[in-house]
């Protein structure tokens, strides 16, 4: 693909040049080619976007629920009509295989938007009778202008996960995509405008997180920030949001999730789940089950089943429909993953497979890392304690149920957890003791629109998807009504 035209900001229903004068480049990580130069939003651009959003939000909130629902449903239709085009752009920008982006990223994002479009008419308050002449009723009102700050691994899906409930509740959103993968969020803005969203209700500000993101989190005109990213960045976002104007926050942060295989499990099923929990999207999924616990007596058999499945991984041309494994999102990220792999070797973990970059035709110019499995891992190892966010699985053994529950919970993270077992009683008994916000039994990874997702501990605050997320983009107003004559004591 030839280099794209310079990408601008999207404010008030159209493209506009950044006033900052700064730009950055986004690359195709499969081959290192520059895709586009992108303008970076500065402080004045954030001010412009907030003013635009404030204007648009008043128009949007004044529409009826059915009017808002119809506009969002039109956006869903356009997303599905343009699925292949958007998936190709997502593949170029992220490096993910087209077989994945064309069937998951846009598809699931559109599903979430459709879900919230259907919920809009059901967003209602309540009536509370107090006595014969006195009652209270409540209204759920939009917050106003909210900000979404996205991560680089699921660019358009995250933009939809954040914008869908925010817009459904009558808010306007200013979205800052990751500077690593900024392209499809701009296309989403076009689609919202085409669907009939009032100007300013969805603005997109590409830029560097340390600058543009900080301007958004500190801006007094922003009522809430929804952030997806790492724990360290999340803490800064939360601190800035609180210090500036006590903004509400939703945080979807990192994970180091346990996948527990019990001795009664079908090991073929367990191996299939472990593969999806570690190598889907080349391991760049926040919920990945990178700590795989297996009974000591099953270790050798499980290792062989994993190795057999690693042989089925097909890395290569990301637009080949048979390819199911792409490069990492960037060269700096690749280098960071390689540092973790080196640390694992240094600390005594045994490399079962992988452990280096992929080499050969088609790989040498890209950010490729081989699918890597470490065995003989210990809980104190760096690769077991810290989030790697790459195709690196750590195998650990255990002897008892109580032991594995304790070790699974021995982490600052609490995003996800899963177990594989044939015993239904054990399944629920163990899941109820795991300290994680998203749990799977005999499966892994699916996050439908109806399912609230989010973390315990350092893995986040609040939830995305589900009914409760729609409510989190509203504020409750209580109105007390007295129908009898008011009695004053004065």
UniProtKB/Swiss-Prot annotation:
List S-S links within the chain: none
One Pfam assignment: Aldedh
Keywords attached to this entry:
Metal-binding, NAD, NADP, Oxidation, Oxidoreductase, Potassium
Q: Which CDD domains does the record match to this protein? A: ALDH_F9_TMBADH (cd07090)
EC number annotated for this UniProt entry: 1.2.1.8
Hey, where's the site called Seems to be a necessary countercharge to the potassium cations on this chain?
A: 248
Tell me the Gene3D superfamilies matching this sequence: Aldehyde Dehydrogenase, Chain A, domain 1, Aldehyde Dehydrogenase, Chain A, domain 2
Q: Which reaction does it catalyse?
A: betaine aldehyde + NAD(+) + H2O = glycine betaine + NADH + 2 H(+)
Where do the catalytic residues lie? 162, 252, 286, 464
Function, please? Involved in the biosynthesis of the osmoprotectant glycine betaine. Catalyzes the irreversible oxidation of betaine aldehyde to the corresponding acid.
Q: Which PANTHER family match?
A: ALDEHYDE DEHYDROGENASE-RELATED (PTHR11699)
What is said about its interaction partners and assembly? Dimer of dimers.
Q: What is this protein called?
A: Betaine aldehyde dehydrogenase
The organism's lineage is: Bacteria, Pseudomonadati, Pseudomonadota, Gammaproteobacteria, Enterobacterales
């Amino acid at each position: 693909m030839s280099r794209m035209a310079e990408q601008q900001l999207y404010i008030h229903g159209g493209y506009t040049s950044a006033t900052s004068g700064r730009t950055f480049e986004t690359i195709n990580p499969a081959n290192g080619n520059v895709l586009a130069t992108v303008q970076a939003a500065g402080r004045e651009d954030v001010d412009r976007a907030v003013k635009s959003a404030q204007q648009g939000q008043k128009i949007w909130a004044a529409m009826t629920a059915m009017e808002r629902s119809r506009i969002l449903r039109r956006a869903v239709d356009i997303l599905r009509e343009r699925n292949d085009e958007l998936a190709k752009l997502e593949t170029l920008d992220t490096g993910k295989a087209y077989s994945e982006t064309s069937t998951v990223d846009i598809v699931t994002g559109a599903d979430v938007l459709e879900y919230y479009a259907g919920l809009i008419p059901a967003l209602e308050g309540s009536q509370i009778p107090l006595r014969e002449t006195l009652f209270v009723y409540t209204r759920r009102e939009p917050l106003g202008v909210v900000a979404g700050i996205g991560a680089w691994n699921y660019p358009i899906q995250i933009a939809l996960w954040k914008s869908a409930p925010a817009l459904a509740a009558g808010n306007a959103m200013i979205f800052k995509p990751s500077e690593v993968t900024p392209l499809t969020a701009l296309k989403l803005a076009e689609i919202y405008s085409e669907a009939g969203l009032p100007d300013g209700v969805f603005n997109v500000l590409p830029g560097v997180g340390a600058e543009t993101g900080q301007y958004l989190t500190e801006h007094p005109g922003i009522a809430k920030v929804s952030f997806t990213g790492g724990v360290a960045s999340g803490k800064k976002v939360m601190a800035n949001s609180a210090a500036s104007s006590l903004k509400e926050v939703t945080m979807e942060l990192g994970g180091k999730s346990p996948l527990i295989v019990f001795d009664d499990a079908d090991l073929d099923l367990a191996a299939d789940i472990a593969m999806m929990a570690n190598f889907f999207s080349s391991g760049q999924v926040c919920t990945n089950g990178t700590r795989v616990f297996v009974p000591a007596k099953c270790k050798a058999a499980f290792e062989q089943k994993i190795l057999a499945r690693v042989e089925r991984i097909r890395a290569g041309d990301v637009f080949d429909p048979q390819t199911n494994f792409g490069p990492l999102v960037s060269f700096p990220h690749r280098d960071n993953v390689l540092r973790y792999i080196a640390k694992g070797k240094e600390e005594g973990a045994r490399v079962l497979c992988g452990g280096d970059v992929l080499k050969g035709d088609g790989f040498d110019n890209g950010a490729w890392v081989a699918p890597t499995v470490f065995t003989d891992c210990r809980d104190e190892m760096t690769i077991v304690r810290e989030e790697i966010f790459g195709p690196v699985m750590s195998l650990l053994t255990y002897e008892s149920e109580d032991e594995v529950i304790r070790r699974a919970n021995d982490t600052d993270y609490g995003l996800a957890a899963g177990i594989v077992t044939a015993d239904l009683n054990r399944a629920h008994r163990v899941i109820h003791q795991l300290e994680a916000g998203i749990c799977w039994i005999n499966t892994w990874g699916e996050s439908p629109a109806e399912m609230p997702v989010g973390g315990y501990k350092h893995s986040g605050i609040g939830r995305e998807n589900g009914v409760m997320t729609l409510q989190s983009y509203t504020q409750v107003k209580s109105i007390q009504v007295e129908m009898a004559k008011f009695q004053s004591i004065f």
